[in-house]
From Swiss-Prot:
<dbReference type="InterPro" id="IPR036428">
    <property type="entry name" value="PCD_sf"/>
</dbReference>
<comment type="similarity">
    <text>Belongs to the pterin-4-alpha-carbinolamine dehydratase family.</text>
</comment>
<protein>
    <recommendedName>
        <fullName>Putative pterin-4-alpha-carbinolamine dehydratase</fullName>
        <ecNumber>4.2.1.96</ecNumber>
    </recommendedName>
</protein>
<dbReference type="InterPro" id="IPR001533">
    <property type="entry name" value="Pterin_deHydtase"/>
</dbReference>
<dbReference type="Pfam" id="PF01329">
    <property type="entry name" value="Pterin_4a"/>
</dbReference>
<keyword id="KW-0456">Lyase</keyword>
<dbReference type="GO" id="GO:0008124">
    <property type="term" value="F:4-alpha-hydroxytetrahydrobiopterin dehydratase activity"/>
</dbReference>
<dbReference type="GO" id="GO:0006729">
    <property type="term" value="P:tetrahydrobiopterin biosynthetic process"/>
</dbReference>
Length: 97
């Protein structure tokens, strides 16, 4: 099971993500980002590639795809906040774009 990020680990793990467009979600210990694609099909293809990793790591995003824009929220429900798995999946999502 994952552990909630400590204050000491937040900066090193989340700082690079914030520099790449991720942001904290108001009122939650979660991060969010919207990915834009040329069309719905490209967005779905990206979501399928991400889904393979999410399933492999047993860590699933909250997300929606509307007209080629995929809104993503990452948090770890088991720890009621952010964990290293959220940072790992966020990095993977960025790399698959």
């Amino acid at each position: 099971m994952s552990e909630r990020l400590s204050e000491e680990t937040r900066g090193p793990l989340l700082g690079p993500l914030f520099a790449n467009g991720w942001a904290m979600v108001d009122g939650r210990d979660a991060i969010a980002k919207t990915f834009a694609f040329d069309n719905f099909v490209e967005a779905m293809g990206w979501m399928m590639r991400v889904a393979i990793w999410a399933e492999k790591w047993n860590h699933h995003p909250e997300w929606s795809n509307v007209y080629g824009k995929v809104a993503v929220v990452l948090t770890t429900h088991d720890v009621d906040g952010l964990s290293a798995l959220d940072a790992k999946l966020a990095r993977k999502m960025d790399s698959l774009c």
